[in-house]
């Protein structure tokens, strides 16, 4: 009712349109069944009838916590179901690409990013020296968080975004995805005292983070994007 009272041009959805968190949704028919159940909701049907929607997937459309190492057959099934049930036009030159951009004159450059399917494996929040699962080789002193080779976007998508950030003259630039971009520390290890007498393993910007599954687990890449965008004007 509140949305109906607004003069909306479109709705943006950043993912988790469905949420698969079990081990039983495996095939294309399984994923299609989940979408059919969700789309039977009359309120959701009314939303789609009233407004166009700009969408991106998160992990809920696949299985909780996905990354580029997801089992390929299951990933392909989930991806195909998403394309079938969501309002997305597949690009002719690259039918598997989902990151894309929209422009409204010189007012706004509106990008949508895939921060799930191309990313490196997440880091364990409580132990930033190791990768998930914990059987992986430990990295010293939180090095995994600040590893410059770790990527959330993947090389092709990152290059595409960096180019867009310096292309065109827009009043606003919107970068859409399902993660908080700011650092969310539970404990800040980067203090004046630590800088004056660095303990073993000290790292500038170090801390205990709320979730290193998000951008706090891909610190170097986030910094690279901030530096690229710094001369430009970004929206809130």
Placement of each model-derived feature along the sequence:
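Long, structured stretches of catalytic cores involved in phosphate-ester chemistry, encompassing
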Residues: 1-236
């Amino acid at each position: 009712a509140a949305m109906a009272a607004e003069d909306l041009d479109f709705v943006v959805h950043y993912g988790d349109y469905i949420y698969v968190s079990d081990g039983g949704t495996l095939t294309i028919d399984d994923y299609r069944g989940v979408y059919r159940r969700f789309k039977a909701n009359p309120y959701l049907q009314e939303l789609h009838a009233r407004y166009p929607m700009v969408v991106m997937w998160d992990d809920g459309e696949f299985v909780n916590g996905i990354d580029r190492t997801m089992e390929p057959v299951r990933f392909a099934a989930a991806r195909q179901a998403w394309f079938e049930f969501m309002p997305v036009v597949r690009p002719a030159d690259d039918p598997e690409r989902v990151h894309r951009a929209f422009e409204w004159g010189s007012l706004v450059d509106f990008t949508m990013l895939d921060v799930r399917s191309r990313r490196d494996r997440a880091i364990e929040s409580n132990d930033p020296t190791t990768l998930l699962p914990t059987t992986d080789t430990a990295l010293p002193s939180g090095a995994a968080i600040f590893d410059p080779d770790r990527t959330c976007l993947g090389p092709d998508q990152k290059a595409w975004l960096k180019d867009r950030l310096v292309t065109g003259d827009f009043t606003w630039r919107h970068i859409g995805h399902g993660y908080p971009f700011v650092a969310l520390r539970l404990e800040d290890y980067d203090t004046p005292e630590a800088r004056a007498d660095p303990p073993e393993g000290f790292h500038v910007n170090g801390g205990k983070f709320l979730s290193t599954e998000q951008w706090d687990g891909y610190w170097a890449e986030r910094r690279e994007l901030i530096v690229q965008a710094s001369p430009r004007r970004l929206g809130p």
